[in-house]
């Protein structure tokens, strides 16, 4: 029984030392109590992530956007669609009107070289 308890203690000690060695190899000592040679930055990664998300999503920082009137936005969107359709119709109608105006105001000219016209 004494042999079994001794081997169990040595086995646990070996397991603990191997895990400590593996953690220190990965860059973070297992048994350190927080007093490190190089102290951590002011904000840890766990603190930086929510702060970054809040900064990138300005809706959380500005409570004035919380009461946006949704029906007015829908009406603005409808007006913009109508304006876009009107613009596209006007844009497609412009070249045909321009060609009609050019043909009526200027007679067709023949190609001439010096005094010989074709």
From Swiss-Prot:
It comes from the Eukaryota. One of its GO terms (molecular function) is hormone activity. Residues 28-108 form a propeptide. InterPro entries: U-IIB, Urotensin_II. Residues 1-27 form the signal peptide. One of its GO terms (cellular component) is extracellular region. The keyword Ribosomal protein does not apply. One of its GO terms (biological process) is regulation of blood pressure. Expressed in a number of tissues includinf brain, thymus, spleen, testis and spinal cord. Disulfide bonds join 112-117. The keyword Signal applies. Its main location: secreted. It is found in: Secreted. Potent vasoconstrictor. Belongs to the urotensin-2 family. This is Urotensin-2B. The lineage of its organism: Eukaryota, Metazoa, Chordata, Craniata, Vertebrata.
């Amino acid at each position: 029984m004494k042999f079994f308890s001794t081997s169990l203690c040595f086995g646990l000690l070996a397991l603990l030392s191997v895990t400590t060695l593996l953690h220190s190899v990965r860059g973070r000592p297992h048994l350190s109590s927080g007093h490190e040679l190089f102290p951590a930055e002011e904000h840890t990664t766990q603190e930086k992530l929510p702060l970054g998300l809040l900064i990138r999503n300005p809706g959380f920082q500005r409570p004035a956007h919380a009461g946006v009137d949704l029906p007015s936005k829908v009406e603005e969107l409808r007006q913009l669609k109508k304006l876009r359709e009107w613009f596209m119709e006007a844009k497609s109608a412009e070249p045909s009107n321009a060609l009609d105006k050019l043909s009526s105001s200027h007679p067709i000219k023949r190609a001439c070289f010096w005094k010989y016209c074709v």
